[in-house]
């Protein structure tokens, strides 16, 4: 990442580190096969394979990177971890690598991503950390960015399979979308089509709590059109928009908008030193 002021800021917030592997190193795979979902549909991801001479070192480096991301480099956890799979996304401009890490003690798995570092993505991740209720851990080294996995149902899958719910849950879905719409606009995060966020569902005493979480921060403050930063204007999101029209009055919509703006303002005040440093980069 060549933007020196941004690199200085990231270093001051402990985002910069020395990685044993770079994004370009993962591009040296020898073969790949399409990764299919449970229904046999193409996921637009490919599982990639490396030569035997390179695989051992790559897997070792990726395991260490996972320890840096999750345990601040505590190498004691490495004894129980191994790399199960490396996937490469062929869709869009980002083209990330998704790394699946297995805990051999219980066969539980987790993921993280290796991406090209750029200023827009770094700004977006930092603003997410400061202004949203969601924290995404990430690390940067030169032109490589490591990003933790955000768990949830992809927005487009959620639209297809999860909207036919109780009226109570449908109202909560519409409410969360209103708040998500505000969060994206206030911090100028664009292109929130349904495949660029996930839906985190938490069972509650009555019904479920819904949280929409961004997974693509590439389009941060990069466009002059207002509507680009409002998820409500992307037709992919129409099914949720229609839920809002069905269940919400204009007064209720304004109430939820004001609630979220107040929460964002509170987060900005509580992190004002860090936010001011970022905005002056």
Regions found by a protein language model. Give the residues of each.
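Long, charge-dense tracts
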Residues: 1-36
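C-terminal catalytic region of ATP-dependent kinase domains
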Residues: 204-281
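Conserved ATP-binding subdomain of kinase catalytic cores across diverse folds
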Residues: 18, 22, 40-156
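Phosphate/pyrophosphate-binding loops and the adjoining catalytic core of nucleotide-dependent enzymes
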Residues: 23-42, 260, 265-272, 279
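Conserved kinase catalytic-core segment
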Residues: 165-226
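Short secondary-structure boundary/capping segments
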Residues: 131, 164, 228-232
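AlphaC helix of the protein kinase catalytic domain
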Residues: 157-164
């Amino acid at each position: 990442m060549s933007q020196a002021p941004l690199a200085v800021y990231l270093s001051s917030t402990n985002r910069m580190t020395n990685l044993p592997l770079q994004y370009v190193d993962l591009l040296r795979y020898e073969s790949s096969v399409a990764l299919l979902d449970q229904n046999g549909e193409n996921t637009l991801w490919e599982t990639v394979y490396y030569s035997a001479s390179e695989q051992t070192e790559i897997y070792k480096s990726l395991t260490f990177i996972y320890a840096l991301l999750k345990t601040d480099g505590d190498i004691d956890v490495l004894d129980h971890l191994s790399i199960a799979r490396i996937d490469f996304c062929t869709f869009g401009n980002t083209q990330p690598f998704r790394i699946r890490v297995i805990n051999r003690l219980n066969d539980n798995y987790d993921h993280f991503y290796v991406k090209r570092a750029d200023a827009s993505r770094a700004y977006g991740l930092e603003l997410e950390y400061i202004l949203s209720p969601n924290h995404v851990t990430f690390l940067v080294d030169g032109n490589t960015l490591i990003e933790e996995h955000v768990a949830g149902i992809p927005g487009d899958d959620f639209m297809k399979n999860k909207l036919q719910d109780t009226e109570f849950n449908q109202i909560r879905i519409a409410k969360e979308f209103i708040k998500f719409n505000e969060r994206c606009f206030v911090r100028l995060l664009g292109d929130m089509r349904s495949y660029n966020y996930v839906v985190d569902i938490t069972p509650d005493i009555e019904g479920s709590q819904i949280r929409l979480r961004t997974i693509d921060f590439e389009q941060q403050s990069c466009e002059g059109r207002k509507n680009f930063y409002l998820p409500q204007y992307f037709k992919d999101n129409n099914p949720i928009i229609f839920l809002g029209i069905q269940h919400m009055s204009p007064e209720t919509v304004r109430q939820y908008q004001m609630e979220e703006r107040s929460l964002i303002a509170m987060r900005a005040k509580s992190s004002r030193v860090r936010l001011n440093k970022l905005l002056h980069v």
